[in-house]
Amino acid sequence: MHDAQIRVAIAGAGGRMGRQLIQAALQMEGVALGAALEREGSSLVGSDAGELAGAGKAGVAVQSSLAAVKDDFDVLIDFTRPEGTLNHLAFCREHGKGMVIGTTGFDDAGKQAIRDAAQDIAIVFAANFSVGVNVLLKLLEKAAKVMGDYTDIEIIEAHHRHKVDAPSGTALAMGEAIAGALNKD
């Protein structure tokens, strides 16, 4: 039996997704929470990541610098904001760390930076990690091909008041799936 664990760092530890990811990492077999990060100046820096996530003491203090924890993780999971993610991307590329990127709202240059880094490090980059949403994207693609140019397609979305990006990455991915199926930009 192989006991190797993937050591993960969670960027945006104090956010909604960050807290859920910390809980998951602490409960998941084969995964160890190696580090938790928040932006410089955050009042959460120094707090215990497990306690922050409501999972009890984990013995991992929230840090503000990837350099401070570079030997504590193999993969960085990042659901922050484009500017932060791109800074993390440069660090991970330089140090050979994998990334899971759930951040949305990148401009074309940001998306290209991720594609370029993927030549050197392992990266999973998705606007939405839900199986249901990814099935929906495939169905939209098929529907758009069947309906072709004979119809107008509109995407309308609503969110909770804490949503940081609008339109959401999921809505943009839906638009891209439809546009791709119709060979439009």
From Swiss-Prot:
Pfam families named in the record: DapB_C, DapB_N
CDD domains associated with the record: DHDPR_N
EC number: 1.17.1.8
Binding of NADP(+), residues: 39
GO process annotations (BP): diaminopimelate biosynthetic process; lysine biosynthetic process via diaminopimelate
Principal cellular location given in the protein's record: cytoplasm
EC top class, as a word: oxidoreductase
Cell location: Cytoplasm
PROSITE patterns tied to this protein: DAPB
Keywords noted in UniProt: Amino-acid biosynthesis, Cytoplasm, Diaminopimelate biosynthesis, Lysine biosynthesis, NAD, NADP, Oxidoreductase
Amino acids binding (S)-2,3,4,5-tetrahydrodipicolinate: 160, 169-170
InterPro entries: DapB_C, DapB_N, DapB_N_CS, DHDPR_bac, NAD(P)-bd_dom_sf
Pathway: Amino-acid biosynthesis; L-lysine biosynthesis via DAP pathway; (S)-tetrahydrodipicolinate from L-aspartate: step 4/4
Binding site for NAD(+): 12-17, 38, 102-104, 126-129
Protein family per UniProt: Belongs to the DapB family.
Subunit structure: Homotetramer.
Role played: Catalyzes the conversion of 4-hydroxy-tetrahydrodipicolinate (HTPA) to tetrahydrodipicolinate.
PANTHER family with a match to the protein in the record: 4-HYDROXY-TETRAHYDRODIPICOLINATE REDUCTASE 1, CHLOROPLASTIC-RELATED, DIHYDRODIPICOLINATE REDUCTASE
Entry protein name: 4-hydroxy-tetrahydrodipicolinate reductase
